[in-house]
A protein has these predicted regions:
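Alpha-helical interface subdomain recognition
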Residues: 1-111
């Protein structure tokens, strides 16, 4: 972690993790306040963003570790595989992006 690029990668990961946490909290609050149906845009945004970003963060960690990152000496390869499978659990990312995109266009009376 003493290498400058690795410090930047760690910083970006921390920033993205914080952003994901806030997005999850926003979706949870929307579910509590608005109800599940009205909160679907927030939930879809989280379902699209979180698994994708977590895969990117794990991939960056694998890159930092080099060949060791894909070996059984670290949990990274298993973590990546598990997270990649999770991206399919709630449906394709494209479906969630469609929900968010349509809602955004409806705000401006374009859809």
């Amino acid at each position: 972690a003493k290498l400058g690029k690795n410090i930047e990668v760690i910083s970006r990961a921390r920033i993205e993790i914080n952003a994901m946490r806030l997005a999850v909290l926003q979706a949870a609050k929307a579910m509590d306040v608005l109800g599940n149906k009205e909160a679907r845009v927030y939930v879809s945004a989280v379902k699209a963003m979180v698994p994708e970003k977590v895969c990117e963060i794990i991939d960056a960690a694998i890159q930092m570790h080099g060949a060791t990152g894909i070996s059984q000496w670290t949990p990274l390869a298993t973590m990546y595989t598990d997270m990649r499978h999770l991206r399919f659990a709630d449906g394709p990312d494209e479906v969630h992006h469609m929900v968010v995109g349509r809602a955004e266009l409806q705000k401006y009376d374009v859809w």
